Amino acid sequence: MKENIISFFILNIFLLGCSSDNNSSEVDETFTVSGKVVDSDGSGLANISLTIGNQTVYSSASGEWSVSNLKDSVKITPMADGYTFTPASATASSTLTVTFVAEKTAIDLSAEAENIVAWFENVQYSNGLLPSTESSSTMSLYDNALAALVFTATGKYSKAESIFNFFNQRIGSELTTNGGFYQFRSTDGTTSGARWVGDNAWLLIALNNYMAKVETTKYDKLKSTLEIWIRSLQDKDGGLWGGITASNSTISKNTEGMIDAYCAVQGYDDFHKKLLAHLKENRYNSTDGLLVSWPGNYYEYALDNHSWGYCTFEDFPKTVLEKTTMYANTQRATANGALITGFAPDIDKDIVWLEGTGQMVVAYQKAADSYKSTTYLAEMRKLLISSTLYPNSVGLPYASNLGTTYGSSQLWKGADTNICISSSAWYLFGLLNFDPMAVGYSRGTPDVDKFWKD
């Protein structure tokens, strides 16, 4: 009996020792939590913030996230402006994998979009064209191309056709006679300004989008004649002349116009190959990995080359969208006093350029960077203003405040207070998740010609 009691005590001591060792092991043990943030279609969402204990991490480009060496119990909470998540949070005290499904916050975007489109419809003249700003008598080719894209994106095809019809009727009197449509014209039809390759390219981009949705041969001649003129501007070095001035002299080559033309002329042939070769040799800083707007100048870079370059060229690096802090700034809006953060057209950073900020939203959406696209869309929303002429019609001014455009040129009076086409259109494209440069994006560019991948 005594031996049994002694054995019992020895066994208990052994078990207690083992228990103590096990508890010590559990205290020292660490674990990993990981998972993914996806949208309702199961696609990964980038740059979603996740608070995990006292740490903050961000989801990768594919939506994945992971944190290791955790102890005790931690709460995992995803956060992003404009989104709700299911589950709203999760708790882990051991290795755990969890997927958060993000849904856009229930903002009545449809009503907002309808009020923007209503403004476009209200300002359209009987001849089909729209003034560039409310109460303006100036009609811009680029702005009307954007308006045609607005109507196409929202299924208002007859409104888009009214714009195309105007130019279709002037193929002989303008396009084939002078080469290219004029940059500006007044409400009575009087033309002025240069005939820019970029503006004409955007009319072709609008046609490409329309013809991708509507089966018609009505605008085949307009499309082919625009393309022929754009191709005719290619120099022997592969670059494109910027167009023709009002005095019929040649406009120097500009990067933005060459991007526009590359996007507008569909397919891939020697035109595109030579154009890429020119950009590589003359308009690309391989050290910075950026397209150059003005070689050797103080204003070397321009914002739209980041966004349009990314949306136009296949496999263009996402890093170009990250290298835009040189333009980021915050201003107090003239129209309503709101503080708004966005991008300037250049390094002066004296305005928030709403059109350019909208272009960045579209580029961020293409890059699946939902955090930044949602953030800057919300910033732009602060400057939605009501029409002074039409009820239930809203839009955005060109800029937050008066300052300079690209370079040192001053903005016009009213650029910070009057609704304009360009900013309103690009904001709407962001609302609709519509990329006008997506049609024809996959053109089979050979890897050897993609200089940005060198």
Predicted features along the sequence, with ranges:
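Bacterial Sec-dependent N-terminal signal peptides
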Residues: 8, 12-35, 99-111
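Structural motif
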Residues: 30-46
